[in-house]
Amino acid sequence: MMEQKIVQIGDIPVANDKPFTLFAGMNVLESRDLAMQICEHYVKVTDKLGIPYVFKASFDKANRSSVHSYRGPGLEEGMKIFQELKDTFGVKIITDVHTEAQAQPVADVVDVIQLPAFLARQTDLVEAMAKTGAVINVKKPQFMSPGQVGNIVEKFAECGNDKIILCERGSCHGYDNLVVDMLGFGVMKKASKGSPIIFDVTHSLQMRDPSGAASGGRREQTVELAKAGLATGIAGLFIEAHPNPDQARCDGPSALPLDKLEPFLAQMKALDDLVKSFASIDIR
């Protein structure tokens, strides 16, 4: 059987054969107070359930569809909020970067820096992120086949960084729709020689409105999609939640209501424990 790589995020070992790690939080930093509220809730629930946890939020949504859409507080204010979250809750942080100049200042504060799906083939950005020495979460582009992720992992390795986590977030299926190929998780593992795979359930539920300026979504299907992904044996889940998804400033239609977080994660942990209790069956 293929050996599974372990990527350490501080004291958290992330691997496809380890108990699942949760990358989760809110889509974008809407305010300091809301970030504190959401992070505190995640920390309480994950501590109670014994789930390794990394808080996620964006400080700048640089790829919004409309020029009028909210982007976030920006780099300087965003890093201040992240540092306060770390100091207050002792939580690890993941956030995305969009330019080479952002890579090091962000890596100086957070624990994982994320390469956005739309930018995953940009070599200059890959090189800048690799040079920070940080753990990298690579969003697989919607236009890229699962087998092609090996090229991204190789590019980071050539730039001196092998601390790579891969994130599935769905593939384009015609116009304005995304689907998740459950066979793709195994292909990604093989193509990357056992890199940890995280499943971004929230963004896989996006469904664009061809006449609108923002994405729609199918949050009512969060549970079934997350269960299907975990059943393949992966390293973790990526989830966004909000106390009032209909009022969220980005991707509310795909966000999990915050009051559903504990029952949702309790089911996910039970399923992950069951799947990883099975002996491997090597079929050739």
Swiss-Prot record:
One of its GO terms (molecular function) is 3-deoxy-8-phosphooctulonate synthase activity. It is an enzyme of class 2 (transferase). GO terms for biological process: keto-3-deoxy-D-manno-octulosonic acid biosynthetic process. SUPFAM superfamilies: Aldolase (SSF51569). It catalyses: D-arabinose 5-phosphate + phosphoenolpyruvate + H2O = 3-deoxy-alpha-D-manno-2-octulosonate-8-phosphate + phosphate. InterPro entries: Aldolase_TIM, DAHP1/KDSA, KDO8P_synthase. It comes from the Bacteria. Keywords: Cytoplasm, Lipopolysaccharide biosynthesis, Transferase. Disulfide bonds: none annotated. Pathway: Carbohydrate biosynthesis; 3-deoxy-D-manno-octulosonate biosynthesis; 3-deoxy-D-manno-octulosonate from D-ribulose 5-phosphate: step 2/3; Bacterial outer membrane biogenesis; lipopolysaccharide biosynthesis. It is found in: Cytoplasm. The keyword Cytoplasm applies. Its EC number is 2.5.1.55. It holds the Pfam family DAHP_synth_1. GO terms for cellular component: cytoplasm. Belongs to the KdsA family. This is 2-dehydro-3-deoxyphosphooctonate aldolase. The gene is kdsA.
